[in-house]
């Protein structure tokens, strides 16, 4: 048992448990069951508090990927696991600051949200018996009791379970795993029987009256009484043959558990078909910026003024012509739309006072591009319910697409460093409590690694475009407003810089519901010749609009400048999430933090500094056909950030489905790598669920191809 405890629990927990036992003069080598029980209890207390924070409004939130600007403090103070003197000091200080009644016994946690101490119990017996013993022992109305059992049951004061379903499920799953691990080593029975009750024991707890009637009413079918059901449950040992257990539970279930071996999994089948095309709302690696440094012009910061100033930095405009038509669109209209933008910007400059916003004339080309008057007329259901052949349109299945090489190039580009900084140091939220100097140190190191990353540029560009579009959609519902696509950054020398990527013209936007769509036409500058990868640009009409002089090693060269024009659409809810893209920074920071935590618990000290400053060490970044790719810690930060940003840019139902379903297969494969001898049933069904999400989405197809590389290397 002692070996099992040392293997199964985090070294920090084991050390705390040993300390606690020594404090009471007990020997972990002799009282091994108690050793295991203390470790389990400690782990449950820590899991209880994990990820739970309080934001600046005093609301409780769960942060696994939260808002980077939130001022967060931990929701729970952990008292369990501190030495007695320290623990009482913490309790006293909480009582002094909050005015809560001082408990007689040391509780396990304090909840800053509900302002109460919590006693956590983990029992190998029945939860309500253990609950009563606890309640009798502490005899305090004020301390909240929450009991978990190894069978997945729980009981809490006034049925108030404090935490959300998912957090409690994590704890129950962990307890169940510990139980299974013990059972598989033949340690469970002695552990289960070794539990002694609390000091004040009330013998057999009788349920009477209303509670008894409710208990009898709520039994599963085929059980005559509560005793009868209890006896059945007590005899239900989880280890052993699952098929038998399933058939015991239901006549309809006949699952054959198949062992999952190295040879079992096959690669995911990626769809065949023409290569997939770019579907992001704005250009990524192909974008070109017209920039002004140290902007100080009149009206600086007003998007339209900034845009006109940026446009004036370029002198190579020429008569536009179409170099790659859109397959299905009326291409001359796209050409006319760009000419109209140029003409109307020229008109603005000829006015005495430049307006703050510009509404475009409703020309026929813009009406066509923005789908004006194209929506079918809505008819009240009452007026047509008698129509005999009323039916929904038949919609075509989406056409399957194959993975194209451009998707991996886009991702690689997103991980690279640019020569500008896109976020300030405090972009990922501020310090809240003094304890958080470690957190702020981590945040600063992390920010330094990602502030120049191209993925960070995409975040700021996404936040700007979505904010501007949502704003215009509400403020100018009927107008075709011209919205410049702008971002701001700092150069290496710390000079401010304003960049213009192109323009958006928004259509009518009477957005009543979150999912109502606003159409827009985007026009974006680029130096990429669309004829090199025409499949990537099938949704675009591309014009050649000028020649740009570029400084290169061999002197100045002239390159054609292109304009990528397309019609697109978005909704209130998508724009709302687009404005929240900074969350990607926090999500990737937290992934890095969990790597640091793992390292710190092995070394038993905070490893933040070493982690970021030891430049020689390499870390696994991902799997490619060549094997496991490794890189510096900065590269890991940027890769995690790029993944998070692409999940936001390419969010789709296909991605949701693929992530959820492939995760199940991933867990099975990891269990196999950890020699846990996993078994599965209906593996074919799981593959089907994963593969029905592989249709045509570029980001999902790339993830599926990475998944296949992972399978290959994981099963070698």
From Swiss-Prot:
PTM section of the record: Phosphorylated on serines and threonines by host kinases, including human casein kinase II.
Binding site for Mn(2+) 2: 80, 108
UniProt keyword Transcription regulation present: no
Residue ranges of the motif Nuclear localization signal 1 (NLS1): 124-139
Cofactor(s) the protein needs: Mn(2+)
Entry's cofactor comment: Binds 2 manganese ions per subunit.
Localization terms from the record: Host cytoplasm; Host nucleus
GO cellular component entries: host cell cytoplasm; host cell nucleus
E.C. numbers: 3.1.-.-
Record-listed Mn(2+) 1 binding positions: 41, 108, 119-120
Broad class of where this protein is predominantly found: host cell
Domain of life from the UniProt record: Viruses
GO molecular function, one term: endonuclease activity
GO biological process: cap snatching; DNA-templated transcription; symbiont-mediated suppression of host gene expression; symbiont-mediated suppression of host mRNA transcription via inhibition of RNA polymerase II activity; viral RNA genome replication; viral translational frameshifting
Keywords: Cap snatching, Endonuclease, Eukaryotic host gene expression shutoff by virus, Eukaryotic host transcription shutoff by virus, Host cytoplasm, Host gene expression shutoff by virus, Host nucleus, Host-virus interaction, Hydrolase, Inhibition of host RNA polymerase II by virus, Manganese, Metal-binding, Nuclease, Phosphoprotein
Motif Nuclear localization signal 2 (NLS2): positions: 184-247
Binding partners and assembly: Influenza RNA polymerase is composed of three subunits: PB1, PB2 and PA. Interacts (via C-terminus) with PB1 (via N-terminus).
Family classification: Belongs to the influenza viruses PA family.
Main function: Plays an essential role in viral RNA transcription and replication by forming the heterotrimeric polymerase complex together with PB1 and PB2 subunits. The complex transcribes viral mRNAs by using a unique mechanism called cap-snatching. It consists in the hijacking and cleavage of host capped pre-mRNAs. These short capped RNAs are then used as primers for viral mRNAs. The PB2 subunit is responsible for the binding of the 5' cap of cellular pre-mRNAs which are subsequently cleaved after 10-13 nucleotides by the PA subunit that carries the endonuclease activity.
Name of protein: Polymerase acidic protein
Organism: Influenza A virus (strain A/Gull/Maryland/704/1977 H13N6)
Gene: PA
């Amino acid at each position: 048992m002692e070996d099992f405890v040392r293997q199964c629990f985090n070294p920090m927990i084991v050390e705390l448990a040993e300390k606690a036992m020594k404090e009471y003069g007990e020997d972990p080598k002799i009282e091994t069951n108690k050793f295991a029980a203390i470790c389990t209890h400690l782990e449950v207390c820590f899991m209880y508090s994990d990820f739970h924070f309080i934001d600046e409004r005093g609301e409780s939130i769960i942060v696994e990927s939260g808002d980077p600007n939130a001022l967060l403090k931990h929701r729970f103070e952990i008292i369990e696991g501190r030495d007695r003197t320290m623990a009482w000091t913490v309790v006293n200080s909480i009582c002094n600051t909050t005015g809560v009644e001082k408990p007689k016994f040391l509780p396990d946690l304090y909840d800053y949200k509900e302002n109460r101490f919590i006693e956590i119990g983990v029992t190998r017996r029945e939860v309500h018996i253990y609950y009563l013993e606890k309640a009798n022992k502490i005899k305090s109305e004020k301390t909240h009791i929450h009991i978990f059992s190894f069978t997945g049951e729980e009981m809490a004061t006034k049925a108030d379970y404090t935490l959300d379903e998912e957090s409690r499920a994590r704890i129950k799953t962990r307890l169940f795993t510990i139980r299974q691990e013990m059972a598989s080593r033949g340690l469970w029975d002695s552990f289960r029987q070794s539990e002694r009750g609390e000091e004040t024991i009330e013998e057999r707890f009788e349920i009477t009256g209303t509670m008894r009637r409710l208990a009898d009413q709520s039994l599963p079918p085929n059980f005559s009484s509560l005793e009868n059901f209890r006896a059945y449950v007590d005899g239900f040992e989880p280890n052993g043959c699952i098929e038998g257990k399933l058939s015991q539970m239901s006549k309809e279930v006949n699952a054959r558990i198949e062992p999952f071996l190295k040879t079992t999994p096959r690669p995911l089948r990626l769809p065949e078909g023409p290569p997939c095309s770019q579907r992001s709302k704005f250009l990524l690696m192909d974008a070109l910026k017209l920039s002004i440094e140290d902007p100080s012009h009149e009206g600086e910061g007003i998007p339209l003024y900034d845009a006109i100033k940026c446009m004036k930095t370029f002198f190579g405009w020429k008569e536009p012509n179409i170099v790659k038509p859109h397959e299905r669109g009326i291409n001359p209209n796209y050409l006319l739309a760009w000419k109209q933008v140029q003409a109307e910007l020229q008109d603005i400059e000829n006015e005495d006072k430049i307006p703050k916003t510009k509404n475009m004339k409703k020309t026929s080309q813009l009406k066509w591009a923005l789908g004006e008057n194209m929506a079918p007329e809505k008819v009240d259901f009452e007026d047509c319910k008698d129509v005999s052949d009323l039916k929904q349109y038949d919609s075509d299945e989406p056409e399957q697409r194959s993975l194209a090489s451009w998707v991996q190039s886009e991702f690689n580009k997103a991980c690279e460093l640019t020569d500008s900084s896109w976020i300030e140091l405090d972009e990922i939220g501020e310090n809240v409590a003094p304890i958080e100097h470690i957190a702020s140190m981590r945040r600063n190191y992390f920010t330094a690694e990602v502030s120049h990353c191209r993925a960070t540029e995409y975040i700021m560009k996404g936040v700007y475009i979505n904010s501007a579009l949502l704003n215009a959609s509400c403020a100018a519902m009927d107008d075709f407003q011209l919205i410049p696509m702008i971002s701001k950054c700092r150069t290496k020398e710390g000079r401010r810089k304003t960049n213009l990527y192109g323009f958006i013209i928004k259509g009518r936007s009477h957005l009543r519901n979150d999912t109502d769509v606003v159409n827009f036409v985007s026009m974006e500058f680029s130096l990429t010749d669309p004829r090199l990868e025409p499949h990537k640009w099938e949704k675009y009409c591309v014009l050649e609009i000028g020649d740009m002089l570029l400084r290169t090693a061999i002197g100045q060269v002239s390159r054609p400048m292109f304009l990528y024009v397309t019609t697109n659409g978005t909704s209130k809810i998508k724009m709302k999430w687009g404005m929240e893209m900074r969350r990607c920074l926090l999500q990737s920071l937290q992934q890095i933090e969990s790597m640091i935590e793992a390292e710190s618990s092995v070394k038993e000290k905070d490893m933040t500094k070493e982690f970021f400053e030891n430049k020689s060490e390499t870390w696994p970044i991902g799997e490619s056909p060549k094997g496991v790719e490794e890189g510096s810690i900065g590269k890991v930060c940027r890769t995690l950030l790029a993944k998070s940003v692409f999940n936001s840019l390419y969010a789709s139902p296909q991605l949701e489905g693929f992530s959820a379903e492939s995760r199940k297969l991933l867990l099975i494969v990891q269990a196999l790598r950890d020699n846990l001898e996993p078994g599965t049933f209906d593996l074919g069904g799981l593959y089907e669920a994963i593969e029905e999400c592989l249709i045509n989405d570029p980001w999902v197809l790339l993830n599926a191809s990475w998944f296949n590389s992972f399978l290959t290397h994981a099963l070698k």
